[in-house]
Amino acid sequence: MTHSLPELLAPAGGREQLEAAVLYGADAVYLGGSALSLRAKCRGFDGPELADAIAFAHRSGVRVYYCLNALPFDEHLPAVEEQLERLPELGADGLIAADPGVIRLAGRLCPSVELHLSTQAHSVNAAAVEFWKEVGVRRINLARELGKDAMTALIRRFPDMDFEVFVHGAMCLSLSGHCLISAWVNNRPANLGLCTQPCRFDYRGIRLTVEEAVRRDGPFLDVTQEEDFSAVWAPMDLCLVRWMRDIVRMGPSALKLEGRTKSGGYVAQVTDAYRTALNLASSEQEEISADDFVTELFHTASRPLCSGFFLPERRVERPPRNFTAHPVVARVLAPAGNDGWRIQARSPWNADSDAELLLPGMKRPVLRAGSYALENHRGEKTDRLNPGMEGVVHLDAPDLRPGMYIRLRPESAPHSPEAEA
């Protein structure tokens, strides 16, 4: 039986991330404004920027879903209504919401815009699907707390509904993101997009001992201590690239990548890996192994990767032995002469370092030191570009395009806290 490929839905926290998602193979992007989209830290799109972003995506054949998935208080509703009224004229392909009040307002103020239910709504059973279907929701993002079999059962029970599955990115400590830690500790409510992620902070326990009396087949809590502090609450990140064929057979309409606060380099690498894995999932070819995809994603990872609740027993991914992450070293901006490209450095780039091009399709041609030359913004030959500096790289790369990225090879990548993932 042949299964159609699900839509690949990538995050677009800003213009660069939008361009990266489109260039590296997303079928659709999700974005929001500067408020009420659950990502107050990302710049988002407002006014003319939003209209231009939607038009840009549509010219590339990419759909755009607008996030209004915060859980607003009464004082926020006028702003919600204003945003909803503008969506039809802007041409948004869908609205992502979680709050029943927002969904009801959307049905009245922008009935032509397709309604998608956010993961914040925590949809885990058939009765909930029936309810959301009755109030006009077309697509439901299934809760990360569901396993493969439970998701498959819901997808097959409701063939007239679209279902979306998160396959990669951060997982919240609490149920479907309904966390109060940030609001309690820092007066920054996560459900209004202001999460400070205190679950990722490092803590030191004073006179604290944790034991679990029943489960004695291993540690209840694995704590790694660095400089006397530990990230005791931080969940691992989700990574389901290894199971692409299984997920395609489940029949979801879309696969979602988390990361609206991430960099353009992150979006490029993660989108490229999942786009390539999806394309290969529709064939019997094994051009790239599952281990290779996981290794590629470790270049973007800031936390351990795992299968979450997808499998009955969680699988934790381990990087290959002696693995070193490749930092993104530059973004390509525009052509500069016959063999040159104007670039912006994202990490320290020394001209005696090997590098590799990030070409769509998981193609990673190597640039050996000596096969390319760097210039600063004045056109002078240089041995080093620092983060934020613009310059020119001269190289032989006919497949390179504006918006693509270059990263260092591991054996030559200097450690730098400034390096972009």
Question: Residue spans of the language-model regions?
Answer:
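Gly/Gly-Pro- and Ser/Thr-rich, intrinsically disordered tail segments characteristic of DNA damage-repair
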Residues: 78, 113, 117-126
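Glycine-rich, positively charged N-terminal anion/phosphate-binding segment
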Residues: 39-55
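Conserved phosphotransfer cores of two-component systems
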Residues: 110
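Surface-exposed amphipathic alpha-helical tracts and adjacent flexible/coil segments at the periphery
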Residues: 1-23, 28-30, 35, 54, ...
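Alpha-helix capping/helix-boundary segments
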Residues: 101-102
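Short beta-strand elements of ligand-binding domains
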Residues: 66, 97, 117-119
